[in-house]
Amino acid sequence: MIVIINASNEQHDLKFSLANLDAIVKEVIQKEQQTCDEVNIYFVDTATICKLHLDYFNDDTPTDCISFPMDKDENSPYKILGEIFVCPQTAIEYALSHELDPYEETTLYLVHGLLHLMGYDDLEENDFLIMKEAEIRHMTHLKKLELYIK
């Protein structure tokens, strides 16, 4: 599977390499039996995620990730899945308060964003449970492969 993954690390809160990013993204897409040609991923600081949250959701509080699916052009053979903005600082804070690994938490936020791009939703309770199950399934699989953002 050839997928162009455009990634940008625009934050300095959590030091990590983007080396595993391609493999993580491809594993999730493949396990979901989806296809795409391109996905854009940005790791951003708290100020940036708050601005995006305010601009698009009228909420100026920090959040874990924000996903923007691309409109599907049925006539185009090239499929851009969308854009994901992940905030590692949110992962650090959550991980510290729950005795978790911030790298695993950041990976979870990436998986969460990918699932949103592939049509999962978490606003209604039933959808939330379905999405949570998918997150657990993917994180378990990635853990077996030792694939985390680190």
Curated annotation (Swiss-Prot):
One of its GO terms (cellular component) is cytoplasm. Its cofactor is Zn(2+). It comes from the Bacteria. Binds 1 zinc ion. Disulfide bonds: none annotated. Single strand-specific metallo-endoribonuclease involved in late-stage 70S ribosome quality control and in maturation of the 3' terminus of the 16S rRNA. This is Endoribonuclease YbeY.
